[in-house]
Amino acid sequence: NPGWDDFWIELQVRLEYLKKLTRDHFREWVESIEVSKVKPVLDLPDTASFITFNYTPTLEYVYGVRPDRILHIHGCVLDKNQLLQFGSPDNNPFELQKMLEEKYGMDDFYGATIQQGVTVACDRCADAWKNIEGNYDALNHFLDSLAKIDTVIIMGNSFDKVDKPYYRDVLAPRYRDAEWVFCEYESNEDKQYD
């Protein structure tokens, strides 16, 4: 029927900018960050390993850390084929799909028009989703490759809601007997690390 596709086509056109923003433009911006001119300010041990939430090759280029000692948990611009994970864990496309299907799934027009709109909305939601639990396998694989860890040093991480699950679900249980050192750029005495 003519016009039945208008809804989801319009939705796709209006939301297409999200894909360009979170994939193309974000990568272009990160690639434009000039790390080769950065001077090292830390003396990092050769035996140290790193989990970085930074998309840039700062550890590799500025500090000479071997790539096998680094896990770029959300991707690195050095790998042109790797998707840089940009967004929030709150943008879960599977939860959105479930909610929309529960709300509109019984509608007479669901199969004819609404379902395609749900698919478009969920695809764009995925473009702005940081799948934290989906990164656990890579994180555990990296950690399994390391020697015994006696000290965990946290630098430059805000411990916000986005990254908290990594600590709660993987790092804290695994390294509960290690010494934990927290380095903050600006002290925030009100902050609590649960």
Each predicted region: which residue ranges?
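Acidic, metal/cofactor-coordinating or nucleic-acid-engaging core segments within structured domains
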Residues: 95-147
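Intrinsically disordered regions, especially transient/low-confidence alpha-helical propensity segments
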Residues: 1-5, 26, 126, 133, ...
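Short, surface-exposed amphipathic charged segments that create phosphate/polyanion-binding patches used
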Residues: 83-93
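Active-site periphery "cap/insert" segments of enzyme catalytic domains
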Residues: 1-80, 140-155, 161-172, 182-183
